[in-house]
Amino acid sequence: MHLKRIEVEGYRASANSPIVCELPGRFSLILGANGSGKTTINEAIALAHPRSFPRLAPIDATALGPTPRMVHVTYEFEADTLYEGALGAYLKRRGLSAPQWCRPLERSLGRVRAGQPLKSSDEYDSIRLVHLPALRNPVDDLSRRDARILLELLRADERKHPETGGLRSLRAQAEGMLNSLTSHPLVGNVEDRIAENLRIISGGVQEHHAFVGTQTVDDTYLARVFEMLVALFPDRATARRLQVSSLGYVNLLHIAVTLAGIPDAGSTPVPDDLPVDCKEADEGAESAPVAGDDELAKAARERLARTAEAADADADSFYPELFHATVLIEEPEAHLHPQLQYGLIRNLRSLVKERPDIQVIMTTHSADLAAACDPEELVVVRKDTDNHTISRLLADLPLSKSLKTQLFQQTRLHLDATRSAALFADRLLIVEGVTEASILRLFGRAWAGSDTRRVGFIDSLAILPVGHKVGQWPLRLLATSGHELVTRIAAVADTDLHDKPLSDAQPPAWHEELNHESARFFWSHPTLEPSLVSGNEALVKDAFTECNLKAPAPVTTETVDQYFVTHPRNKGRFALALALLIDQNLSSITVPTHISDMFAWLYDGSEPDSTPIDDVT
């Protein structure tokens, strides 16, 4: 069972239009740029769950929009019963549906309050949300005055290893240690001095007596006296407090302790009725010796005491006997090296496979986290052209099964940290190689000129070199009509028609399936380098000289094309030298028409002018 769908309206980014986010399964990564709506989804999940730990910090009521204001969540059973958790199996066994409920969002003393769920408590009583917000403080949670997260870890281990005596044994040991402190001579001397003064002061009315005692040893006390330490070596003596430890490793420790504190809910459903064999029970009762009334009363009192203690422990514990845990982690990449980010994702994915009662949802800005995931686990949150937040599940790509399988295979192969950055982009440029990316960004700066808004656009533009000729991947992944993950995506590709005019170019048939409003090709004829020559002949000639190469005479589009047809190995050296010269002469270069049109369309959707115009800056 897992959280499948979140719908929120009248709150933050959903104030103008509802936000619907669907999740692929028990592991999912929600990614998107700043301001796309991820925080709205995160807080909607937290507000929707009545049973959450730790408590969500108060949210200012200005986050509320016009009515209606509510959040609706829907859980779903696993498609394969082999991967169903204990709670899901129990509900299915009783013929019940997966939980779903709705909560209104209300104002309360200037804060946002989630109202009473509009469903029976049976729907959500066994669902637990563990929320690690972006503004979490691991040092406070693990080592300060109220480290309750450690207490949940102790309770989880008590369930797993009851033979240790659990928290009851730990409290007894702590109480014995504290009581021994009061017998110390120093404490006795202080106690006598205070008691004498109090007797003198209070003797005129009613004499009182003072004693130095210790705190009541309960679970709250245990939460205060424990703290986590971190060491580089497996030696307790070398452990250091978290305040002086690496922030990245403290963040990892926080996640590790939180997950370890989730007890095992079991792998089999809890039976509806306890399997008691009455006959065997009667026979056992007959064979037992008859106890006296006093012994029976004493045994009954002990049972009642144990039952009351167990009830108190259950009330204090966050997790019931049968539950499903939804773990929401915001920005787990905080302070983490990319290698640690990759390992974290792999570990969490393994955890979800091993423990069917846990679902992990993460939100991130990290391309490294996205690269470590399977494409079908990714959810992209973005703004559409109307500034409404939309959520796209990659697994729902509306393509044929064979084509989608092919695209996902290529995505798994190519989705490294560099390419996964494309999933965060609003506008994206696709090129074949890294040299094209470098040259085109420089031409973009020349195109922008002194326009500060255009300069900012070029500097932040995501340029993705795919390392091969631009094909269906990644355009069909990012810009399939009706399922766009970007606002606009442009591809600069070569026609490779060395002896034919540009009008003879025949793009593949699949180009027609792209939405012309969101995806376009711009052609370099016949390749990028020759298409840059017109108006930049002197610069191109200087680039040949910088590479110690003999420039063709004269330098024209045709001669440069023929040169690289016969000397393809010199292309890389030439491109690097040309990029350096462009960077040094931005004010005097000519931007080719197809490149100028490409940047203008990416920038604001402007259509090319009826007559070609080269931007000379």
Where are these predicted regions, by residue range?
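Conserved P-loop NTP-binding catalytic core
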Residues: N42-L91
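H-loop/switch region of ABC-family ATPase nucleotide-binding domains
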Residues: T363-H365
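Walker B catalytic acidic pair
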Residues: E330-P332
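Electropositive, glycine-dotted interaction segments
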Residues: H72, E78-G176, G188, D192, ...
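Extended helical coiled-coil dimerization/tether regions that scaffold
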Residues: D141-R144, L153-V327
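Pre-Walker A-like glycine/lysine-rich segment at the N-terminus of P-loop NTPase domains
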Residues: M1-L47, A63
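Acidic, divalent-metal-binding catalytic cores of TOPRIM
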Residues: K38, K383-T617
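Pre-Walker A adenine-sensing motif
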Residues: E9-V20, A313-S317, H414-A417
